[in-house]
């Protein structure tokens, strides 16, 4: 899920 948040920043 943390990776998903990182993708959201993109």
UniProtKB/Swiss-Prot annotation:
Coiled coil: none annotated. GO terms for cellular component: extracellular region. Belongs to the tachykinin family. The modification Pyrrolidone carboxylic acid is found at residue 1. The keyword Phosphoprotein does not apply. Keywords: Amidation, Pyrrolidone carboxylic acid, Secreted. Expressed by the venom gland. This is Tachykinin-like peptide-VI. It comes from Phoneutria nigriventer. It is found in: Secreted. The modification Methionine amide is found at residue 10. The keyword Secreted applies.
């Amino acid at each position: 899920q943390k990776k998903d948040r990182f993708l959201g920043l993109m």
